[in-house]
Amino acid sequence: MRLAKYIGVMAKPQNDTTTAISMTAPVLMSRGAGDGADTPVGASEGSHSNPFSPEENAKTYKMAFFMPASRFSKASDAPKPTNPDVTIKDVPARTLAVHTFSGNLRQAAIAERGERLRRALEADGVAAKEGAEVMAAGYNPPWTPWFLKTNEVMLEVSGM
């Protein structure tokens, strides 16, 4: 909800200029708090129930989306969040391995597909970046029927 409030999905945007910002896809999810160095522009982190896994107990995760490049070419161009738990960051280019799948984006599916991606990389002789965490990406609004949803798991790779 923090990101939705920042961009003004349901009410007045919670940013220093009260500028409404278009929602973009994908929305990224990753487990674990950290310094956010790997988090795209428009990131929020904290301890919440994963919106993609409502049956889960509260977990710490990061949620992020990409700012529209047509309006904000760098993080400093974007309106400043009024909520200190929302951060805006530039993310350097990186190489990600991606596995696409359909269905609901649940923690069990993320874990299974992430492991499948790791095994495929290993079989192809591609190394995941040391300490890389699986990220989940959802491309559809919540009201999309489960069988029409497009999701991805992503893992940063090194040496490519």
Q: What label would you give each PLM region?
A:
Residues 1-160:
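A solvent-exposed interaction/effector surface
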